[in-house]
């Protein structure tokens, strides 16, 4: 299977180390990532208006490129995953959006949602398996208590993304456990960190982040791990240490 890879803007800039680590780990685990030869920003925010056709074009172009090379598209950024998978769902289920996008792009073969969109964590869980991952860990994170921070883009809306249970997810805890650490469950792991609110209302964003960190710390977490580089930035740059 060919795992076409969409890195996205953040993993190509601010979170380049995460991108490099993900590529290397994928090679070791046997699913080398093949970066799309050309890609554009996904838009970062899913367009809610059904007539927002231009905002969907870059995601569809990436989906079409993946369709032509095996039909699987993997991304690591929760925001990119959220946007691209929801746009893919639009193309598969919404006739009006599909017709308008295809009319604009003038594709030789119209696109109708054929590409499978996977988050990197889904590949680890469903294609590789936690047992194999655990066996290949060379430096287990022993005696580390780690809280998973899901945020709001990785899981919702559950009916479309279908990555894990929206209220009681387990994928990141299983990942943490496979790395040798002890996963810590805390109530705010699915709450929004503020996202782009940091640009408009930094004080409110700092409060949200502080609440999340303090909640995790009160449950025994020594550190947090997240699948979203944007969340990682917010959690690092804003709020009290917890």
What feature does the model see in each segment?
Residues 1-242:
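Iron-sulfur cluster-binding electron-transfer modules in prokaryotic oxidoreductases
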């Amino acid at each position: 299977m060919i795992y076409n890879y969409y890195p996205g803007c953040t993993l190509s800039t601010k979170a380049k180390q995460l991108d490099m680590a993900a590529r290397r780990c994928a090679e070791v685990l046997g699913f080398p990532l093949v970066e799309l030869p050309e890609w554009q920003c996904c838009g970062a925010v899913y367009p809610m208006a059904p007539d927002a056709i231009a905002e969907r074009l870059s995601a569809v172009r990436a989906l079409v490129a993946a369709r032509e090379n095996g039909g699987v598209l993997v991304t690591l950024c929760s925001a990119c995953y959220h946007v691209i998978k929801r746009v893919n769902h639009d193309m598969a289920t919404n006739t009006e959006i599909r017709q308008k996008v295809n009319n604009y792009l003038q594709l030789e073969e119209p696109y109708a949602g054929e590409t499978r969109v996977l988050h990197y964590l889904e590949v680890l869980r469903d294609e590789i398996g936690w047992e194999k991952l655990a066996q290949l860990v060379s430096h287990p994170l022993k005696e580390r208590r780690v809280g998973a921070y899901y945020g709001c883009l990785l899981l919702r809306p559950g009916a479309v993304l279908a990555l894990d249970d929206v209220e009681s997810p387990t994928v990141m805890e299983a990942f943490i456990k496979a790395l040798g650490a002890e996963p810590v469950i805390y109530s705010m792991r699915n709450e929004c960190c503020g996202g782009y609110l940091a640009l408009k209302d930094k004080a409110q964003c700092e409060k949200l982040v502080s609440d999340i960190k303090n909640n995790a710390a009160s449950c025994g977490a020594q550190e947090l791990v997240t699948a979203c580089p944007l969340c990682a930035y917010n959690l690092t740059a804003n709020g009290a240490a917890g």
